[in-house]
Regions:
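Nuclease catalytic cores that cleave nucleic-acid phosphodiester bonds
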Residues: 1, 15, 19, 26-39, ...
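Conserved P-loop NTPase mechanochemical-coupling segment
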Residues: 3-14
Length: 176
C-alpha cells in the first residue's frame, strides 16, 4: 500500500494536515472520489515558473496546460477536482462551467472573483466532504480554512503533482 512506502511524504492526518495545512504527499490515492480539490487557476499559473512563462506569450495555452496537468492529477488521485478562473473583469461575462476530461472548469461571472467563488464552493462542499483548496493567497487560505477546508499553497501543490507524476513514471510507465 502507498501509505506504508518510505519517501511518499506525510500521510493524511499528519500534523500539518490536522492544522488545516496540506503538505506535498499529504494526499493518498482514494478508491472513491469523495475528496474535493479546488484550485485557484490563475494563482497556480502565476506561481509556477513554466506556466507563468507560457502565460506571458499566450494565457490560453497556460490555462490549457494547467487543465491537462490537473486532469492527469485527478485521474491518479480519483478526487473531484474543480479549477476556478477569474472572469470578473470581463464585461457582460455570464460565467461558464464545463467539464474538461474528468475535472470541472469554472470561469466566474462579471463582478465575481475566483476567491469569492472558491469560498462559496468550499462552504457548500466542506459540510459533507473533505476539501483541499490550492492557492497561495493568504486571505483566501484563512477564509477557506475557517470553512473547514485544508489549504495547500500553489508551490506545495506543484511538489505534490511532481510526486504523483514520478510515482506514475516509476510504477505504470516501466518498459518491462
Amino acid at each position: 500500500s502507498r501509505d506504508r512506502q518510505p519517501g511518499n511524504g506525510p500521510l493524511v492526518g499528519s500534523r500539518p494536515a490536522d492544522r488545516g495545512i496540506a503538505t506535498p504527499g499529504a494526499f493518498k490515492r482514494r478508491k472513491s472520489g469523495e475528496d474535493y480539490v479546488i484550485v485557484d487557476g490563475y494563482n497556480v499559473i502565476f506561481a509556477w515558473d513554466t506556466l507563468r512563462e507560457l502565460s506571458e506569450h499566450n494565457i490560453d495555452s497556460a490555462r490549457g496546460k494547467l487543465m491537462d496537468i490537473l486532469s492527469n492529477y485527478q485521474g491518479y488521485m480519483n478526487c473531484h477536482l474543480i479549477v476556478v478562473f477569474d472572469g470578473y473583469k470581463v464585461k457582460d461575462n455570464k460565467g461558464e462551467r464545463f467539464p474538461y476530461d474528468d475535472i470541472e472548469v469554472v470561469y466566474t461571472k462579471e463582478g465575481e472573483t475566483a476567491d469569492a467563488h472558491i469560498e462559496k464552493l468550499t462552504h457548500e462542499i466542506a459540510r459533507k466532504h473533505k476539501v483541499t483548496v490550492v492557492t497561495s493567497d493568504g486571505l483566501e487560505q484563512i477564509v477557506t480554512m475557517g470553512q473547514g477546508a485544508i489549504r495547500m499553497s500553489s508551490r506545495d501543490f506543484k511538489a505534490e503533482v511532481e510526486r504523483v507524476n514520478e510515482h506514475l513514471r516509476e510504477n505504470y510507465l516501466k518498459n518491462d
